[in-house]
Each structure stands twice: as structure tokens, then as C-alpha cells.
């Protein structure tokens, strides 16, 4: 047994539950007929090989559990399941979440009585406990009173608690009626009948499990040597070696090894009438489609009042808000460290457990996060997906691209029309324009300086409080600003991203780079002028020394 796949995102939780319920109901409608023909849990189950099951991720296994439990509950509601299948018992246990192997024979109830009144009424409820069974027997005795089955129900009531200890007594009355009434079949892959009912203390009946270890498995896989009891199961297994996927899902063109998996997934997505005209993705509710369309239109309706940053989705906006409020609701129980997102806490916990679940198939190296593994894999493949839009240079890691972009930032081509200040990127210019358009409503109570954003005021306040939240792990030195901290880290890493085009000399910080560039002009350029007396200097340090005089 294994599970069907699904790719629903976290924003579709409520819709997914409705879709699973509809899928379960649709499968039951196909199974239940007007004349109450035999239906079992086996009719609405999805069978897979162990290889297929092990390839599914936790979300896909959880979807399988929800659908199968829904199917079983619906069957029980209309009375088509007498004994709880072992699969359901397994799904309800916590071993399911641990991904343990699933190998269960399925039980099928067959009702062979000719009393249609009892057949329709006795099977109305899920007869899985002694009390429910007793209620069903009483109801059956009322319906069948005066018929050839009347004596049968008289013998059944009351159910004795010592049935199991009295094998000689025939508690079910006429043995012929007992055989006609209840026959439980346990089937293997070839459909052979393997066992019948005996009595149990809990329900009055329990399946007598005959050993299947001796069953012949005459179909052996030539690739791995695994044996199967039927040709069809061998063929399905062999597709795991060949990669053949015969069953295609029409909506996205995805293929599956098992036909029932393809059918179930198509059923789960059948009720999605709201389709995206851009990519064809379907949604059950128009609200979900509207949210999805933002990925195509670029609409970002959620704007932060603190910094002006905009977001597509409300949950992203809420998480961003914590960067301003300082809220960190997810706390590590081991060390007390707090995080703004649950994913951050999950990754941090691995530092305590030593768990590195993401391993490289090429060299075996393991990583805490999938993003680190992806970056590492690029060292094997040579992939460089991060490309500079200005010069076309490509990088394997986004942080390397960001460092490279700082070189272009010195080329200040985007100029402010109000004050003449220039910027390397249009986005930086747009942020700067807010300083002209917005009111400086955040004022420092210490010195009276005003700021556009509360975050800028918080950074400024560190001058007065002496707070230095950025501490170097290498040497312990602390800084009040992140930019100063980043520049300091380069003294340990040796990174020098600012390179002179004239002589090739590289520098850690942009200020040193600008001072060096002046040395190549061979002029007495003195861009740093004193506002008090007008005296000019070629270096900012000289200007600062001069200003002390005033």
C-alpha cells in the first residue's frame, strides 16, 4: 500500500479538505448501488508497491491518509464495513508519521443472507464494537421475526463475554445459517480465499489469519530478484527500474506508474472549475484564483507602513512585520533562542540534534537545509543561475551576485531630479524619493533629528544608547550598524569587492575605494568642503580633523 501525490500549497488548506471530502464521496457514489450490492474497503483503496510508497514525501502520505480514512468512514456510515481493516488501524497509529513499511492484507466482508430487510437495516451502522453489534442483532431479530432467520438472531443474543473460552458451544445457532450469513475473505493478489471468521472477545468475531509466508511467489524480477505472486504486480514493480509511466494526467501531462494513483489525483482535481488563463492551473474557489493571479500581474496589495515594502500575500506581509516589531514567537526549548518563522526554528533545532537530512548523492556530504544542498550541488554541475543584468556575469550563489552588484552600484546612473543625488539602481532612487515626498514623522527625543521611517529612528537611537547588536563571531567585536559589521567581516574572509579599474587594486569598503580613485586623477580635486569656512580637502578624514577646530 502506498499513497497518492498532491501539490497543494499552504494557502489552500481549507480548499484541500473540501476537495478530499468530495473525492471520497465521488468514489463511494461509484461503488454504492441501488440494490445494495457487495462493497468493501478494497473497492475504494489505492494499491501501490513498496517502491512507490517510499518515493512519496510526507505531504503526499498525509493526503493519502486523509482520503483513505474518509473513504472508510463513509463506508462505515452506510454499513459496508464490519471489521476495521488493518490499513485503517495502521493509518491511525503514530507509526504512519515515521514512514515505516506498510504491508497489510485487506479484509473483505461478504453478506450472503437472503433476508433483504435485514441486509438493508442491520448494516446501517459501523458494527465495530460489542454494543453496536448487539444493537444490530436486536434490530435484525425484529425485522426477521417469523422468518427462517428468526431463530438465528435468538441464538445470537445476548453476546457472551466468554465466547472465546467456549469453543465447543455454537453461539451462532445453526452452522449452515452462520456460514450463509457471515463469510470473511482475506484475499491475496491472486484473489484466493485464505480465511474465515472465528470468535473474539471484543466484537464476537475475529479473522482467523492463515499464514501467507508459504504462498508461492512465482514471478521474480530479473533486475533486483524481488518476487511477486502475480504477473501484474511484477510488471508494475518493473516500471520502477525502467522509469516507464504509462498513465498520464491530462491536466499537467504528469505521468504515473500506477493507474489508480493517476485516477485518484485526477479525481481530487476534477472539481476545479476556475482556471488560470496564463498557466492553466485550476482552483476550486475564485478567491484562490485571484490570489494566484498576483504571480502573473505582479500585484502586491500588502504594503508595510514602516518601510514601504510590498508583498503578494498576507502571510508574507505578516512575517515581514515581525522584523519591525521584533516579535519572535517560535522559541527553541533547548537554548531559548527565538525566531520569527517556524521554518527558522525547525532548521535551528537540527543544530542541537545534529540532524542533516539533505545529503548530496554525488559525494555524500550532508546539509541542514535544502537551500545549502542546492548550492552545493552546483559545485558538481557547474550551474550558475544568478546573472548580473548589467554585465552578464553569472554566479552560483546569490550572495556572490549581491557582492558583485556593489561594484556596479558605484556607477551612479540614476539621479534624483530634486537634489541631484545619484544612485546605482533605480530601486535605490525610488527609496530615496520617499525622503522628499514623505513627512519625517519620527523624531529623536535626544537630539531632535527627524526620520521618514521608524526603523531609521531605531538605528539612529543606537548612537545615544550605545547599543551594538551586531557582534563578530570571530573576534567578538560589536557594531551598531549592519553595514559596518559586514565591512568588518571582510577583514576575516579576505573579501575585497571594490577593485580599481586603473591599477587592479582591491578594497574592503567603498570609501577607501573612492579615496584611491582620486589618486588616479592627478588633480588637486578637493570634493570635501567645510560648511563653516568653505575650506576644501581631498579626503574626508582631513575634513573631519579640520572640523574639530570649529
Curated annotation (Swiss-Prot):
<dbReference type="InterPro" id="IPR001909">
    <property type="entry name" value="KRAB"/>
</dbReference>
<dbReference type="GO" id="GO:0006355">
    <property type="term" value="P:regulation of DNA-templated transcription"/>
</dbReference>
<keyword id="KW-0804">Transcription</keyword>
<keyword id="KW-0805">Transcription regulation</keyword>
<dbReference type="Pfam" id="PF01352">
    <property type="entry name" value="KRAB"/>
</dbReference>
<feature type="zinc finger region" description="C2H2-type 11">
    <location>
        <begin position="528"/>
        <end position="550"/>
    </location>
</feature>
<dbReference type="Pfam" id="PF13465">
    <property type="entry name" value="zf-H2C2_2"/>
</dbReference>
<keyword id="KW-0677">Repeat</keyword>
<feature type="zinc finger region" description="C2H2-type 1">
    <location>
        <begin position="219"/>
        <end position="241"/>
    </location>
</feature>
<keyword id="KW-0479">Metal-binding</keyword>
<feature type="zinc finger region" description="C2H2-type 7">
    <location>
        <begin position="414"/>
        <end position="436"/>
    </location>
</feature>
<dbReference type="InterPro" id="IPR050331">
    <property type="entry name" value="Zinc_finger"/>
</dbReference>
<feature type="zinc finger region" description="C2H2-type 8">
    <location>
        <begin position="442"/>
        <end position="464"/>
    </location>
</feature>
<keyword id="KW-0539">Nucleus</keyword>
<keyword id="KW-0862">Zinc</keyword>
<feature type="zinc finger region" description="C2H2-type 9">
    <location>
        <begin position="470"/>
        <end position="492"/>
    </location>
</feature>
<dbReference type="InterPro" id="IPR036236">
    <property type="entry name" value="Znf_C2H2_sf"/>
</dbReference>
<dbReference type="Pfam" id="PF00096">
    <property type="entry name" value="zf-C2H2"/>
</dbReference>
<keyword id="KW-0863">Zinc-finger</keyword>
<feature type="zinc finger region" description="C2H2-type 5">
    <location>
        <begin position="358"/>
        <end position="380"/>
    </location>
</feature>
<feature type="zinc finger region" description="C2H2-type 2">
    <location>
        <begin position="274"/>
        <end position="296"/>
    </location>
</feature>
<feature type="domain" description="KRAB">
    <location>
        <begin position="39"/>
        <end position="110"/>
    </location>
</feature>
<dbReference type="InterPro" id="IPR036051">
    <property type="entry name" value="KRAB_dom_sf"/>
</dbReference>
<feature type="zinc finger region" description="C2H2-type 6">
    <location>
        <begin position="386"/>
        <end position="408"/>
    </location>
</feature>
<feature type="zinc finger region" description="C2H2-type 3">
    <location>
        <begin position="302"/>
        <end position="324"/>
    </location>
</feature>
<dbReference type="GO" id="GO:0005634">
    <property type="term" value="C:nucleus"/>
</dbReference>
<dbReference type="InterPro" id="IPR013087">
    <property type="entry name" value="Znf_C2H2_type"/>
</dbReference>
<feature type="zinc finger region" description="C2H2-type 4">
    <location>
        <begin position="330"/>
        <end position="352"/>
    </location>
</feature>
<comment type="function">
    <text>May be involved in transcriptional regulation.</text>
</comment>
<protein>
    <recommendedName>
        <fullName>Zinc finger protein 426</fullName>
    </recommendedName>
</protein>
<dbReference type="GO" id="GO:0008270">
    <property type="term" value="F:zinc ion binding"/>
</dbReference>
<feature type="zinc finger region" description="C2H2-type 10">
    <location>
        <begin position="498"/>
        <end position="522"/>
    </location>
</feature>
<dbReference type="GO" id="GO:0003677">
    <property type="term" value="F:DNA binding"/>
</dbReference>
<keyword id="KW-0238">DNA-binding</keyword>
Amino acid at each position: 500500500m502506498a499513497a497518492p501525490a498532491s501539490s497543494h500549497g499552504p494557502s489552500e488548506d481549507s480548499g484541500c479538505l473540501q476537495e478530499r471530502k468530495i473525492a471520497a464521496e465521488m468514489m463511494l457514489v461509484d461503488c454504492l448501488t441501488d440494490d445494495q450490492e457487495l462493497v468493501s474497503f478494497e473497492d475504494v483503496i489505492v494499491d501501490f508497491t513498496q517502491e512507490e510508497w517510499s518515493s512519496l514525501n510526507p505531504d503526499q502520505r498525509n493526503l493519502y491518509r486523509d482520503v483513505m480514512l474518509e473513504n472508510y468512514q463513509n463506508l462505515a456510515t452506510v454499513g459496508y464495513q464490519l471489521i476495521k481493516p488493518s490499513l485503517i488501524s495502521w493509518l491511525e497509529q503514530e507509526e504512519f508519521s515515521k514512514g515505516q513499511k506498510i504491508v497489510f492484507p485487506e479484509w473483505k466482508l461478504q453478506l450472503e443472507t437472503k433476508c433483504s430487510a435485514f441486509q438493508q437495516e442491520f448494516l446501517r451502522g459501523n458494527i465495530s464494537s460489542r454494543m453496536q453489534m448487539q444493537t444490530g442483532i436486536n434490530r435484525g431479530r425484529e425485522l426477521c421475526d417469523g422468518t427462517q432467520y428468526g431463530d438465528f438472531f435468538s441464538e445470537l443474543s445476548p453476546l457472551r463475554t466468554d465466547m472465546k473460552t467456549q469453543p465447543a458451544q455454537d453461539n451462532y445457532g445453526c452452522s449452515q445459517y452462520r456460514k450463509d450469513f457471515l463469510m470473511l475473505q482475506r484475499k491475496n493478489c491472486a484473489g484466493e480465499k485464505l480465511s474465515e471468521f472465528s470468535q473474539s472477545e471484543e466484537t464476537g468475531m475475529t479473522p482467523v489469519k492463515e499464514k501467507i509466508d508459504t504462498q508461492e511467489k512465482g514471478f521474480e524480477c530479473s533486475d533486483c530478484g524481488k518476487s511477486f505472486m502475480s504477473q501484474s504486480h511484477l510488471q508494475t514493480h518493473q516500471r520502477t527500474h525502467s522509469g516507464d509511466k504509462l498513465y498520464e494526467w491530462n491536466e499537467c501531462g504528469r505521468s504515473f506508474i500506477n493507474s489508480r494513483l493517476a485516477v485518484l489525483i485526477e479525481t481530487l482535481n476534477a472539481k476545479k472549475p476556475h482556471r488560470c488563463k496564463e498557466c492553466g492551473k485550476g482552483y476550486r474557489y475564485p478567491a484562490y484564483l485571484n490570489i494566484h493571479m498576483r504571480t502573473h500581474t505582479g500585484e502586491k496589495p500588502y504594503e508595510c507602513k514602516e518601510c514601504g515594502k510590498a508583498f503578494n500575500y498576507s502571510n508574507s506581509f505578516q512575517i515581514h512585520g515581525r522584523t519591525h516589531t521584533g516579535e519572535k514567537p517560535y522559541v527553541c526549548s533547548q537554548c531559548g533562542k527565538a525566531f520569527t518563522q517556524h521554518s527558522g526554528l525547525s532548521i535551528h533545532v537540527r543544530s542541537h540534534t545534529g540532524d542533516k537530512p539533505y545529503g548530496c548523492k554525488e559525494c555524500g556530504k550532508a546539509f541542514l537545509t535544502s537551500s545549502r544542498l542546492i548550492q552545493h550541488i552546483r559545485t558538481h554541475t557547474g550551474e550558475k543561475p544568478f546573472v548580473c543584468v548589467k554585465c552578464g556575469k553569472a554566479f552560483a550563489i546569490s550572495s556572490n551576485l549581491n557582492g558583485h552588484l556593489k561594484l556596479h552600484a558605484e556607477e551612479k546612473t540614476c539621479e534624483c531630479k530634486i537634489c541631484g543625488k545619484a544612485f546605482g539602481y533605480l530601486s535605490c532612487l525610488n527609496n530615496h524619493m520617499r525622503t522628499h515626498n514623505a513627512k519625517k514623522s519620527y523624531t529623536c527625543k535626544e537630539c531632535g533629528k527627524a526620520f521618514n521611517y521608524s526603523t531609521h529612528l531605531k538605528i539612529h537611537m543606537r548612537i545615544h544608547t550605545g547599543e551594538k547588536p551586531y557582534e563578530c563571531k570571530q573576534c567578538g567585536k560589536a557594531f551598531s550598524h549592519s553595514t559596518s559589521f559586514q565591512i568588518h567581516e571582510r577583514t576575516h574572509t579576505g573579501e575585497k569587492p571594490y577593485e580599481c579599474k586603473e591599477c587592479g587594486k582591491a578594497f574592503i569598503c567603498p570609501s577607501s575605494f573612492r579615496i584611491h580613485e582620486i589618486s588616479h586623477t592627478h588633480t588637486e580635486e578637493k570634493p570635501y568642503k567645510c560648511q563653516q569656512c568653505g575650506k576644501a580637502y581631498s579626503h574626508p578624514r582631513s575634513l573631519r580633523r579640520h572640523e574639530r577646530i570649529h
